[in-house]
Design a protein with these regions (language model features):
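Conserved active-site and cofactor/substrate-binding residues in soluble primary-metabolism enzymes
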Residues: 18, 43-50, 59, 74, ...
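Short helix/loop capping segments that flank catalytic or ligand/cofactor-binding pockets
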Residues: 11, 33-35, 102, 160-161, ...
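Fold-independent oxyanion-binding glycine-rich loops
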Residues: 3-6, 10-12, 25-29, 36-38, ...
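A glycine-rich, aromatic-flanked flexible loop/lid motif
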Residues: 142, 148-150, 196-212, 235-237, ...
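Active-site gating/interface segments in enzymes
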Residues: 98-101, 105-111, 125, 179-227
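Ferredoxin-type iron-sulfur electron-transfer modules in oxidoreductases and energy-metabolism complexes
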Residues: 210-223, 233, 237-297
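Hydrophobic alpha-helical positions that pack around
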Residues: 61-171, 177-181, 192
């Protein structure tokens, strides 16, 4: 599986590489708190470059761009030093804005192209930095993915750290190793604060796609009625109108949900973050997506 968070199978991207000119290696990590890929690249820059070369060959691409936030000049220099004049592999600094890590925004920023369904339509394959490192270790050393780098952070964990843990390790043990919780009632998120999923308790295990554990104060259910201010629509990177999708959800109007482009939502969390009524808009849109998908089945 890919290690970028979605767990999309890496091999699928390289099955039909016709027309692919670029491979973009995503080391952006635009979500707050998360620095697991940063730590991985700092420690394994040589493997990252080796993985980039392998991915370039698999995709039969002309150029590989290793995309890193401009706010990490130390990481940029580290990777540039590891390149050692590697042919067709370049470091591409990108702005530190959210959601720069989303593949559509990354393609727009680096290649100045738009596409409909998949990045291959713009002549690109997107791969995560940790995936590139794992590919290098698999090819050179025959190593399987048995460990995962995670960022354990947030206001309610005593000793936040980037940790390397075995896949399948209980989250409760990881939290304990980081000093435990700072208060009795917390909000535990698998992932980052914007796109992560809130988990009821810490009785679950690490999988290969997990990149962070975020521990925040328990959310107060202080939502009020929608003000119809339109901020969720103004800030949606996919150009959707979450307020109208939510209205369609409440009316159970599946055709309207689909018409409003609900399946284009990337669940970035921006609409929930910006909502002055403190409504979990992202969860409403997520529910609408599930309903549309079930109807298609």
């Amino acid at each position: 599986v890919g290690l970028g968070g979605a767990g999309f199978p890496t091999y699928v991207k390289y099955m039909k590489p016709d027309g692919v000119d670029y491979v973009l290696i995503n080391a952006v990590e635009c979500e707050p708190y998360i620095t697991a890929d940063y730590r991985s690249v700092m420690e394994d820059a040589a493997d990252l470059v080796t993985g980039a070369k392998i991915m370039k060959k698999m995709a039969e691409a002309k150029t590989v761009y290793i995309c890193i936030k401009e706010s990490h000049p130390d990481l940029i220099e580290k990777v540039k030093s590891a390149l050692n004049d590697a042919a067709g592999v370049e470091v591409r600094p990108v702005p530190d804005v959210y959601p720069m890590g989303w593949e559509r925004v990354l393609v727009r920023e680096v290649l100045h192209k738009e596409y409909g369904g998949l990045p291959a339509e713009a002549g690109a394959i997107i791969g995560n930095a940790s995936s590139a490192i794992a590919i290098a270790k698999a090819f050179e050393k025959g190593e399987a993915i048995t460990q995962k780098n995670l960022t354990v952070s947030g206001e309610c964990v005593k000793d936040p750290h980037n940790v390397c843990v075995p896949v399948g390790m209980p989250v409760s043990e990881i939290i304990e190793a980081c000093g435990g919780y700072t208060q009795d009632t917390v909000r535990l998120i698998s992932g980052g604060p914007m796109m992560g999923k809130t988990i009821v308790n810490d009785m679950f295990v690490v999988d290969r796609a997990m990149n962070a554990l975020t521990v925040l104060p328990a959310a107060n259910d202080d939502a009020i009625a929608c003000l119809r201010c339109g901020k969720c629509s103004d800030h949606c990177p996919s150009g959707l109108q979450p307020v109208r999708i939510t209205a369609a959800l409440k009316a159970n109007d599946v055709d309207e949900m689909s018409k409003r482009g609900v399946m284009s939502c990337i669940e970035c969390g921006m609409c929930t973050y910006i909502c002055p009524s403190h409504i979990d808009v992202t969860e409403n849109v997520r529910k609408a997506k599930r309903i549309v998908m079930l109807k298609k089945k």
